Design a protein with these regions (language model features):
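Active-site-proximal loop/turn and secondary-structure-junction residues that shape catalytic pockets
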Residues: 26, 58-59, 111-113, 141-143, ...
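Active-site-adjacent C-terminal substructures of enzyme catalytic domains
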Residues: 219-220, 224-276, 281-282
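An N-terminally biased module of ancient metal coordination in phosphate/nucleic-acid-related enzymes
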Residues: 1-115, 119-123, 211-218, 267, ...
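Glycine-enriched alpha-helix->loop->beta-strand junction motifs that scaffold or abut catalytic
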Residues: 50, 129-134, 236, 267-269
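Extended substrate/RNA-proximal surfaces in nucleic-acid metabolism proteins
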Residues: 75-230
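Conserved, mostly hydrophobic/aromatic
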Residues: 23, 44, 135, 199, ...
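Short, composition-biased local secondary-structure segments
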Residues: 2-17, 198, 225-235, 260
Length: 305
């Protein structure tokens, strides 16, 4: 092993010994780089990826704005709008036709779990599930101190505005996050429920900023275990999201090494995801020196020992 931080990637890779990126965004992402998606596909081919899964942020329900209390820009740039969905699907289909002989391209959505809006999400999946694959369920919004919902990953300042005194109660805040995620995992989203759970512990994105401890308390450990057990029983899988490595106040894979170990013991598979929003993100994850395959190879050696 070459001592890279990607050594944290550990567990049962559903695409063992294959170069597959299961979490990538497109030129349509409102908080992305704007890089042309065709050029991202060409970069993926150059990096010898066998498969790339586009998982653009699914539109949020219009009514959600009434219970959202955070920064307006965070909401406005969070996801596609409903009138962009067909454009996104057409883009993906065009890319499949253009590059399909060189790389397997999957088209799906990253869907938000929003308590109180489950029927909207199920309706969306019922409509678009038949024409998509590799959909991901993620938690980007959570109820704050004053009620209402706030974006979890927009900025440290927004996080402080949302959770106030809870900032000094890390265990309480983490507990609320994992309780919410568990509800999402248990929710019946129908036959087209997302097969993967995105960046499972992204609550830690600002850990270093708030000087939080890296360890989970016993309550959070129990909640995570229940989440993983539920996913295993449902035949679902984890998004091993490498974007956390490049986040200024995180510096870790989502999920943590500890959670990776729990998932491995349970036999819960994962798929590596760059969460790329740009060509550079793909390069950083899969290019020379990233050693992602070396990390996976070492993980398998540990598991087979």
């Amino acid at each position: 092993m070459k001592g890279t931080r990607e050594a944290e990637v550990f567990g049962i890779n559903r695409y063992r010994n294959r170069r597959v990126d299961g979490h990538v965004h497109t030129e349509l992402c409102p908080h992305g780089s704007g890089d042309k998606t065709a050029l991202m596909v060409e970069k993926a081919i150059e990096l010898h990826l066998e498969k790339i899964c586009f998982t653009e942020h699914a539109p949020l329900p219009v009514e959600f704005s009434k219970v959202y209390l955070g920064d307006k820009k965070a909401l406005d740039t969070a996801a596609l709008t409903l009138d962009q969905v067909e454009t996104y699907l057409a883009l993906g289909n065009d890319l499949q036709k253009e590059y399909g002989e060189a790389i397997d391209i999957s088209l799906g959505f990253e869907v938000d779990y929003l308590p109180g809006f489950e029927s909207y999400t199920r309706s969306f999946l019922d409509q678009y599930g038949p024409v998509t694959g590799d959909n991901i369920l993620s938690l980007h919004f959570m109820e704050g101190m004053a009620g209402g919902y706030w974006c979890l990953d927009y900025s440290p300042q927004e996080f402080e505005n949302a959770f106030g005194p809870w900032i000094d109660q890390q265990d309480l805040l983490y507990g609320r996050y994992f309780e919410t995620l568990l509800k999402g995992v248990r929710t019946d989203f129908g036959p087209y429920r997302p097969k993967r759970i995105g960046h499972l512990d992204s609550i830690k994105k600002f850990n270093r900023y708030f000087h939080w401890k890296p360890e989970l308390d016993d309550k959070s450990k129990g909640l995570v275990l229940e989440i993983l057990r539920t996913l295993k029983s449902q035949g679902r899988e984890l998004d091993y999201n490498l974007s956390g490595l490049s986040k200024e106040y995180c510096g870790e894979v989502y999920p943590s090494r500890y959670i990776q170990g729990m998932a491995y013991v349970l036999g819960l598979p994962y798929v590596v995801g760059s969460d790329a929003h740009s060509i550079l993100d793909l390069q950083k994850t899969w290019g020379p020196g990233a050693a992602i395959l070396d990390a996976q190879a070492e993980a398998h050696e540990e598991g087979d020992a």
